[in-house]
Design a protein with these regions (language model features):
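A short, structured active-site edge motif that brings together acidic residues
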Residues: 18, 76-91
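N-terminal helical cap/lid subdomain that shapes the substrate entry/recognition surface
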Residues: 1-39
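Acidic, Mg2+-coordinating phosphoryl-transfer loop and its flanking beta/alpha structural elements
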Residues: 112-152
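Conserved donor sugar-nucleotide recognition element shared by glycan-biosynthetic enzymes
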Residues: 1, 37, 90-93, 151
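Short beta->alpha linker loops
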Residues: 39-40, 61, 88, 116, ...
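Conserved H-loop
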Residues: 11, 76-80, 107
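Short, acidic loop-to-helix structural element flanking the phosphoryl-transfer center
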Residues: 26-57, 63-70
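Conserved Lys-Pro-Asp/Glu-containing loop-to-beta segment of HAD-superfamily phosphomonoesterases
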Residues: 92-122
Length: 164
């Protein structure tokens, strides 16, 4: 999180980081229920599930928040495994990624990490797994092109990529 704040010109000293992060998370917790999930997300999750593709979530969100979000949007039945971090500074996503991969109990060649940040691409590289980047999330397509992984812009494209 601090490296992202630095990139966008926000202060990164510990006090400012704590304040900005706390304010963001508190607002997000209050307002996420008025958000909508991306168009095509439910259809994509259902299509992948219907053909037997195992789906899981690895997130920089606090695990308790992540579970609340997933339950609110009634997505829990799509995911076999859900892993979030233990603090809201997203400092542990790389660390929990190894445990998450172990829980999948499958060959790395069968795992595809679908993410929306360069950090997700870095995690995939560190885990030595394939990655597909989604430009409709945190990082723009311009930023995501810094990675060598393929980029898609819709959930229909995600489904087509996975099913091809």
């Amino acid at each position: 999180v601090s490296s992202y704040y630095d990139q966008v010109g926000l202060p990164t000293d510990l006090e400012s980081l704590n304040k900005i992060s706390s304010e963001f998370i508190n607002k997000y917790r209050k307002l996420y229920k008025v958000c909508n999930i991306h168009s095509g997300a439910n259809a994509c999750f259902e299509k992948l599930r219907s053909v037997g593709i195992y789906q899981s979530v690895l997130s920089a969100s606090m695990e308790s928040d992540l579970l609340s979000f997933i339950l609110h949007f009634k997505l829990d039945h799509y995911f076999e495994n859900i892993s979030g971090v233990g603090d809201f500074f997203a400092s542990g996503k790389s660390n929990i990624s190894h445990d998450h991969l172990k829980k999948l109990n499958t060959d790395k060649s069968k795992v595809l990490l679908i993410g929306d940040t360069l950090h997700d691409a870095e995690i995939a590289q560190n885990l030595e797994i394939d990655c597909l980047l989604f430009s409709g999330g945190h990082n723009s397509v311009e930023i995501l092109t810094e990675s060598d992984f393929p980029i898609v812009g819709t959930f229909d494209e995600i489904c087509n990529y996975v099913l091809d």
